Each structure stands twice: as C-alpha cells, then as structure tokens.
C-alpha cells in the first residue's frame, strides 16, 4: 500500500498540467458555500503514466492561471472535484465530436473569498474562465482552442480500493456482535474453500436444477430466443464441458480458465442470456445478475456486449453499468446537512442526492436524448425512470425539484426529504434492474442490500487480487460465483520497487509475489480449476502454434482445420509477409524484423526506437491504403491494425503520428501498451519491442503471451537479436524471448534490415 500512496504523492509533486474547458455552472447544485461548475478535461494519451482520475478517485484541482478582481489577485487552488460521467458521451449527436471523448468534472468552487484587506466577499471567480459559446443546450457548444485552461490534480493518497479489500477481509475474520452482520454460511464455506481448495467439506450446487432451461435449451417450452440458441449450439466441446460442469459446483464457486480467443466472455454472456432471456412462468422479474470486472473500460464493454446480445434476441433486459458506489455512499456529502453524523450512520444510509442532482441538471441542459445503443449508468437510469414516473410515483420529489428550479431555498427538512425521496428512487431502480456491470470495489459494502443477484460473474478474474476477490464472496450469496480468466496471460498489478526504481522512493514489497497470485491462479496451481477452454478461434494463419507451445504445453489448439486457417484475406497477408521476407516461404503469419541499425532512446524512465517507429508507420500506412487488406469478420470492411509496444514513450510517439492520419485510417488503428492490449485484438499487429541492448521486461511470460496473441491474421515483431540474450552473462539467454527468436529463425521468418 505504501508504494501506491507514494505514486500518488509523486503525481502530486509532478503537477502535470491538463487541458480543460470551463463549460457552465450547475445551477441546481449551488449552495450557500459553493457553486459547482462543469469542466470538460482532455485525457492524456497514456492514462496510467499520467495518473488521470476515474469516477471512483478522490482528488482536488488547482487552476494554473490566477484571476484578478478589484485590484486583487486570487488563486483557485485546492478545489474539491469529482469525475462524473460525461453527459455528452451517450448523446447521439453533438456539434463538437471531440467532447464525447473528454472527461467531465464537477468542480465545487467556493463562493466566499478573502480579499487583500482580509474581508470575506462573494465572488464568482470561475466565470472568468467560462467558454464564450454559452448555449442553453450543451450538445450545441463548440470548444475553441484559445479558450482552454490548464489545471493540475491533487490526489487524495488514501485508496478506496485498499479500504474495500481490507473491509471484505475483516468482514470474514472479525467476530460480529450481531448475528446478521456477518457473512452467510455459504459465503463462509466459499471463504474456507479458497484457503484450501481440496478441503473435504463441500456442498454442491446444480444450476441446471435452479434454471431448468439449462438442461435442454432447445425445448420449445423454454422459448429461448433464436439468437441465443444459435450461439449455444455453436459451443465447442470445451464450452459444452464447462456448461455441463454447472451441474456440480463445489460450495458455489466455479472456475473457468480459458486461452486467448477461446470465448470466455462470450460463454459468460450466453449463460447469462439463457438464464435471463428464456420464458418465465409465474415470475414478474428476471433472475438478477451481477457482472464484475476490475477495469472500468471492461465494465462498459461487457455491459454493451450483453445489451447488444439481448437486443438481437429481442428481449428487453434492464441493464445498468455502475462506477463508484463507494463514492456515492461515503463521499456524496449530505447537502446542507450536519457533518457531525458518524461514519456508521452515513454508511447505513447511502446518499445518492449529489449524483442525482448532477444528472438531473445536466439532462435539462441537453436537448438530444441519450443514445439508446449505450447502456445507462445507474444515475442516468434513475433519472430516466423518474422522468417517466414522476407524476405518479415520485410527486414529492418532483415538488422539491420544482422548488429548487424556481430559485427558492430549501429548508433543512426539505433537504432531508429530498435525500429520502432520492434514496427511494434508487432503491426502486436497483430492485427492478436485471443486469448490473460494475467493478468489485463499486460492489462492496451496502450495495448488497440494494441488489441481490442470483448469479455473479467475475470476468478477467486472474487480473484481480485475492483481496479484491473477497468482495463478492463477503457481501453476496448468489446461487453461484463464476470466475473466468486466463492465468497464463494476466496477474494482479502490484507496485514493487525494482533495483532501478529504489531511487524514486518506492520500497521493496516482501509480499509482492503473494499479492500477484490471484485466487484463480492458486486454483490452477493445485488443479482446482473446474473447466478449461483451450480452443483458439481468434488466430488464423497458424498464429496459435507458437504461444501454444510456449505457454500452454501445446494444449491450445486452433478452432479451424488446416484448410480453413488461410481464407482469402489471410492468404493475401501471407503474400505480403513473404514480400518482406525476401519472397521466402512463410509457414505461419508471424515474422520478426531485425533492424540492425536501430537504437533505443530513453526519455525519462521510458524508451522509444525512432527507426522502428518510422518503419512501422510506413508499413501501417501501406496496408491501410491497400484494398486487398480486408477485415476477417467483414470482408466489406478494411482490415484493422494494432500497434503494441511495452513502453509509454513509444506509445506517445505513435499516438502523435496516428493523429495526423485521415479519420478513416484512425478508426482502423489502435495504439496500446502491451499491458493495455489484453482483451483487444486486430487483423494485423505490429509489436515494437523497442529495446536494442536488453530484453527489458518483455521476457515476462504473461506479458509476452498477451503480446503475441492479439493478431487475427498476421503479426510483425520488431525485435533485435540482443533481446534473446541476457547482458553480462556469457552465453546467457533470455528465457522466453530466446524461444520466440529461435523458433522464428528455425522457420526462416526473420527479416534483417
């Protein structure tokens, strides 16, 4: 924990500047003390390296420029801020399309300021920075470059994740004074089981019994939609074995480990669809499902993917994506209320008022509706439900909002009633929601009192720390917890000081190795994983072969027979690779380009390689202009490209170059660090290893596995021969990169330039 807090201190000391535009005051949230403003902030290209807040982070902002009023100069610093969902992200049409990609902040600016004479006076200082395009509808605004301001971020070094993880552990281990305050018996048995996977005491649960449609989805009486049934029938043997294993789940815990391209998330989605989309007899509500991923973007992707599946199936499922329940619970301050309330009291009564009023205010400032193809957040869903039912079910709340809109001040009792009405609204919305996608940290604590899922999926479970895994086990008692992931690709992130980093103030963490071992990895280590998915349906052109041999004991196999691995588009790229390879035969669509005159260049603590950079961009633009380069999934579309590299400086350089390309090319191109590439794929992948004197950190098996399993049709690796060796050791060879080099050399697929 020290290292994570230290990094936040480093970010604070660095005082990195971010471009922002001051849009409009949020009039319905003005109090006697603060006037909230909506900011739109341009995210940096490398979010991780820059320390850019998410909706669950705690921070303040400083404006770089000062404001002069009445002969005095004022500094707008240490101003509390919250990242909120961008109100224009989900709008179908906006005038300035850049806005949809920006982050939105609610910034609570003080109304009272001290002048040079020591007097407290009311000033609206932030209006000095407000953009000139002051449309009543936010979707009509346009951001002028010369009107941008600069801000810096001051992080709260305390971690909400750390608190949530330890609270979950204490929930299991501390003696409870009240019997109903602790975990259920089923949760306790699951907790004991993950301490010893082969313990003798096990209760077995049968999901096929709980959901009869699982036993035979094709029976007409279950009325499973064709779109879901068609996908179910396409299950391979591995998928079917995992599906049948749901008949005997030990203590409700089920682990499914899957290789790249094996359809892990798809398997989850089809199972969820079978449970929720079949015909329901004598049931008004569908069986609720909680879908957890510990990465916010993956949360959004999962919600969108399930929504698309249900849309295709013609079934109306109420789906919500949720970021940041802990902030809503602990940090949405009781507006105009007493601050003397104990932590226990504020914990017991979640206060949604602040978020709801933000959403309400912003909704009234946009004339276009939310894009129906984008899953709403919890706050958006609550506002939309209120709008549909305000005259019937929420008349009291409507009267209070009308009172606020008229400019009339609310009394203390009014604010209490407002919080009560909003809390009831959120309870109603959560009670009628069928599917919630969120992070484990957002699901911690009192959320379990509002939403009681029958099934919990934890996708990318091998990426979650063991303490994170405890959160769904501690607070929920579903029929089953289903964990899916790939222990060969990902592991939890734990910041630890390597030798080269000790000067930066980071400390050696003696528990780092233990913290990097996920619950799923431990289960795999003792052969306690229930099912394995080892059929790769992503890779064509024999791209599956090498990672299978290196990382999966040659058990990962292609989902296609030999005749089907080279459809026309893949065969076209084989010819392209052969042209790079001096017209030598290429037996699989992977080559290494060894640029002997290239050199790495260091920028701060990161690297890039200018010669690699130029060559990759030249080849990428060549392919993007080639009509023969087609998408594998849709031959009518041009193929896609991923440029992956281990180093943030190299990513920044590629991003800058790609931004100058035509918009149509940019839409077909991704630039990612290798660590961010997990879960992404492209038709052609350029993997720029950058380094020329050492293997760097690419000799890590999980990182390398991710790197060489992203391509669907072809993979081009820029790598120097020196990366196959360990510097300073005579004849010493890197463990994994040497295998990559030797295999490619053996098959005559190394191109030396």
Cite the ranges covered by each PLM segment.
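Pre-ATPase regulatory/linker segments immediately N-terminal to the P-loop/RecA-like helicase/translocase core
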Residues: 1-245, 331-399, 511-513
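Beta-strand cores of modular interaction/reader domains in eukaryotic scaffold and signaling proteins
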Residues: 40, 60-62, 106-108, 124, ...
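Loop/turn elements at beta-strand to alpha-helix junctions within RNA-recognition modules
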Residues: 108-111, 295-297, 647-648
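Residue-level recognition of the N-termini of beta-strands and the immediately preceding loop/turn
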Residues: 203, 207-210, 286-289, 317-320, ...
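ASCE P-loop NTPase helicase motor core
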Residues: 229-336, 417-552, 737-746
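Glycine-rich phosphate-binding "P-loop"
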Residues: 230-231, 251-274, 395-409, 584-622
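Conserved helicase NTPase catalytic core signature
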Residues: 352-453
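Conserved helicase motor core of SF1/SF2 NTP-dependent helicases
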Residues: 441-458, 462-753
């Amino acid at each position: 924990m020290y290292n994570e807090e230290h990094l936040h201190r480093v970010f604070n000391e660095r005082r990195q500047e971010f471009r922002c535009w001051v849009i409009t005051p949020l009039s319905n949230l003005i109090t006697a003390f603060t006037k909230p403003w909506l900011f739109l902030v341009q995210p940096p290209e490398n979010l991780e390296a820059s320390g850019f807040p998410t909706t669950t982070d705690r921070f303040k902002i400083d404006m770089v420029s000062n404001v002069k009023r009445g002969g005095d100069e004022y500094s707008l610093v240490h101003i509390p801020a919250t990242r909120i969902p961008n109100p224009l992200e989900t709008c179908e049409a906006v005038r300035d399309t850049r806005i949809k990609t920006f982050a939105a902040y609610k910034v609570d600016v003080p109304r009272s300021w001290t002048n040079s004479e020591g007097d407290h006076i009311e000033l609206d200082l932030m209006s000095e920075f407000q953009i000139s395009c002051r449309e009543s509808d936010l979707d009509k605004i346009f951001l002028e470059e010369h009107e941008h301001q600069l801000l810096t971020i001051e992080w709260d070094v305390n971690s909400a994740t750390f608190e949530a993880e330890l609270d979950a552990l204490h929930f299991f281990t501390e003696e409870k004074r009240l019997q109903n305050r602790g975990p259920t018996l089923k949760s306790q048995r699951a907790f004991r089981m993950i301490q010893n996977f082969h313990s003798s005491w096990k209760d077995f649960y049968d999901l096929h019994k709980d959901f009869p449609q699982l036993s035979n989805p094709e029976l007409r009486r279950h009325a499973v939609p064709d779109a879901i049934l068609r996908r179910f029938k396409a299950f391979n043997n591995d998928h079917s074995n995992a599906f049948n294993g749901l008949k005997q789940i030990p203590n409700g815990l089920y682990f499914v480990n899957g290789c790249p391209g094996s359809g892990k998330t798809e398997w989850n989605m089809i199972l969820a669809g079978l449970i929720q989309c079949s015909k329901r007899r004598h049931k008004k509500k569908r069986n609720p499902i909680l879908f957890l991923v510990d990465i916010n973007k993956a949360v959004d992707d999962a919600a969108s993917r399930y929504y698309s599946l249900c849309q295709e199936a013609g079934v109306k499922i109420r789906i919500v994506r949720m970021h940041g329940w802990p902030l809503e619970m602990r940090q949405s301050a009781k507006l105009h209320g007493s601050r003397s309330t104990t932590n226990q009291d504020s914990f017991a009564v979640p206060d949604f008022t602040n978020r709801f009023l933000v959403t309400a205010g912003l909704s009234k400032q946009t004339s276009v509706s939310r894009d129906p193809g984008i899953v709403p957040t919890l706050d958006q869903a609550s506002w939309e439900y209120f709008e549909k039912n305000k005259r019937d079910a929420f008349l009291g709340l409507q009267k209070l909002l009308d009172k606020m809109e008229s400019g009339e001040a609310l009394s203390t009792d009014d604010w209490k009633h407002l919080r009560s009405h909003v809390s009831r609204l959120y309870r109603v919305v959560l009670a009628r929601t069928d599917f919630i996608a969120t992070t484990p940290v957002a699901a911690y604590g009192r959320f379990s009192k509002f939403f009681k899922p029958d099934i919990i999926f934890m996708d990318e479970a091998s990426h979650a720390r063991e303490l994170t895994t405890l959160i769904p086990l501690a607070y929920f008692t579903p029929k089953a917890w289903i964990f899916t992931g790939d222990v060969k690709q990902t592991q939890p992130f734990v910041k630890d000081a390597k030798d080269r980093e000790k000067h930066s103030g980071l400390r050696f963490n003696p528990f780092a190795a233990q913290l990097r071992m996920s619950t799923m990895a431990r289960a795999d280590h003792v052969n306690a994983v229930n099912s394995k998915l080892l059929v790769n349906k992503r890779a064509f052109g024999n791209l599956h072969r090498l990672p299978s041999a290196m990382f999966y004991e040659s058990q990962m196999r292609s989902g296609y027979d030999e005749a089907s691995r080279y459809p026309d588009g893949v065969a076209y790229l084989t010819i392209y690779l052969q042209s790079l390879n001096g017209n030598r035969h290429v037996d699989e669509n992977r080559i290494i380009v060894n640029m002997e005159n290239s050199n790495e260049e260091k920028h701060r603590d990161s690297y890039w390689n200018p010669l690699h950079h130029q060559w990759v961009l030249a080849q990428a633009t060549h392919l993007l202009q080639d009509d023969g380069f087609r998408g594998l999934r849709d031959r009518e579309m041009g193929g896609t490209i991923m440029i992956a590299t281990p180093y943030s400086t190299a990513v920044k350089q590629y991003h800058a170059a790609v931004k100058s390309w035509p918009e149509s090319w940019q839409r077909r191109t991704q630039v990612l660090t290798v660590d961010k590439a997990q879960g992404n794929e492209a038709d052609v992948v350029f993997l720029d290893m950058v380094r020329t004197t050492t293997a760097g950190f690419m000799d890590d098996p999980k990182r390398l596995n991710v790197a060489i399993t992203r391509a669907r049709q072809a993979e081009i690796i820029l790598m120097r021969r020196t990366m196959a060796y360990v510097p300073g050791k005579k004849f010493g060879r890197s463990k994994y990169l040497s295998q990559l080099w030797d295999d490619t050399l053996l098959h005559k697929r190394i191109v030396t330039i």
